[in-house]
Amino acid sequence: MSVAAKYYPNEPTEPKVVTSEIPGPESKAKVASLGEVFDSRPAYFVADYAKSSGNYIVDVDGNKFLDVYAQISSIALGYNNPALIEAAKSDKMIRALVDRPALGNFPGADLEDILKQLLKFAPKGQNKIWSGLSGADANELAFKAAFMYYRQLQRGGHGIDFSEEENSSVMENTSPGSPQLAVLSFKKAFHGRLFASGSSTCSKPIHKLDFPAFNWPHGEYPVYKYPLSENEEENKKEDDRCLAIVEDLIKSWPTPVAALIIEPIQSEGGDNHASKYFLQSLRDLTSKYNVVYIIDEVQTGVGATGKFWCHEWADIQPPVDLVTFSKKFQSAGYWFHDDRFIPNKAYRQFNTWCGDPARMIIAGAIGQEIVDNNLVDQCARVGDYLFEKLEKLQAKYPTRLINLRGKNRGTFIAFDLETSAERDQLLKLLKSNGCNVGGCAEKSVRLRPSLTFEEKHADIFVDALEKSIGQL
């Protein structure tokens, strides 16, 4: 029995669209009503989560969509997963929800077990965790950890105390207590919409407009030619070009670069992939210049690329310093392994909640279900199957499926259209044909199904895609 059949015996066998347009009349009415108390303008439709099942999301009009977007890559196991429902019913979960603890000051007796369950799924080389609330929060926390680590090294070691000048100047937001330091990120990156994470984000103006930003550098992320197997020499030159820019920025930026953050696949920025060579070379550069190396696995993590963590494809040595996570884990935070990233004093990395044990319980259950059901291997297998079908479709419609990418990266697949208007129209047609799919960057389509997405779902999606292409 397949995993989807075991989990979801009542999952729809195919999409069903019952309204003449998406969103339908009931969704439109509810979006308008919701808009009186909440900004509902980004809503595609209003979902009925009680009726959604497995790989299908149902809206309030009764439309049943094959979901190849999964809440912007955040649903790992499909809708109404029975194992997660059982985890939600546990006494441990009830305590975490009803009496949410301030974990820093009053950790529960079960917190160690909750964290050790999560640590079973940490990336190779990482054995410690700091928990947060969202992907952006995870990156902000990682930046703080990097800055504190960097400054302690400058002071002379972990045990060196702050100077009187540091203690007084920090209250005026001036140096040396508030040092001028930078995080290097990449053009087209997305690391969140808060202030530090927003300064490192560089994908769309709408993410950043009107907000003050730190003067931080953005390197060039390599842009490869596809298929990769036919452009190895040229793509290697592109890697080297971008690496030279990164090294120059580290050496010449007016403020010291304390950390570098990168997505192994830029997701919001267009599903741009970084090669093993590029990611390892960044490790070499960060080690050479004593820059903290942060991998942002918020969207790429938890199995979707055919590894539990995407950067494991690169086998980076020595291991990166910090790895941030959220989305499919339904929790957030960063992994690390070096005790020097624990601040030299308490209350430096701190807030009331210090994470959310309820979400950590769910994250642990998600990880266990993934491992017990070999869902990472399944995702790799289904991704290969889906990619092969898309290659055939690309050969048939070469001007409609451009730069197909994500081969051997599970279901983390994307392709381009010629224009943003054409891409937007294709996404609209896909919904009309029963598939909920998302876009990224200016003209890309990204596939982000759950880990319970199987070959039968891939067949339905490819058929709907071909039908939609024919309607463009």
Swiss-Prot record:
Which PROSITE patterns does the record match to this protein?
AA_TRANSFER_CLASS_3 (PS00600)
Q: What is its EC number?
A: 2.6.1.19
Tell me the domain of life: Eukaryota
Q: Which UniProt keywords apply?
A: Aminotransferase, Cytoplasm, Pyridoxal phosphate, Transferase
Question: Could you state a single Gene Ontology molecular function term?
Answer: pyridoxal phosphate binding
* Cofactor dependence: pyridoxal 5'-phosphate
Which residues participate in substrate binding?
193
Q: What class of enzyme is it?
A: transferase
| Keyword Transferase part of the UniProt annotation | yes
State the Gene3D superfamilies in the record. Aspartate Aminotransferase, domain 1, Type I PLP-dependent aspartate aminotransferase-like (Major domain)
Q: Where does pyridoxal 5'-phosphate bind?
A: 135-136, 352
- InterPro entries noted in UniProt: 4NH2But_aminotransferase_euk, Aminotrans_3, Aminotrans_3_PPA_site, PyrdxlP-dep_Trfase, PyrdxlP-dep_Trfase_major, PyrdxlP-dep_Trfase_small
Instruction: Return the similarity comment.
Output: Belongs to the class-III pyridoxal-phosphate-dependent aminotransferase family.
Extra facts: Induced 4.7-fold in an arginase-negative strain during exponential growth.
What does this protein do, in the record's words?
A: Required for the degradation of gamma-aminobutyric acid (GABA), which is important for utilization of GABA as nitrogen source and for oxidative stress tolerance. Deaminates GABA to succinate semialdehyde, which in turn is converted to succinate by the succinate-semialdehyde dehydrogenase UGA2. May be involved in an alternative, arginase-independent arginine degradation pathway via GABA.
Name of the protein described by the UniProt record: 4-aminobutyrate aminotransferase
Identify the species of origin. Answer: Kluyveromyces lactis (strain ATCC 8585 / CBS 2359 / DSM 70799 / NBRC 1267 / NRRL Y-1140 / WM37)
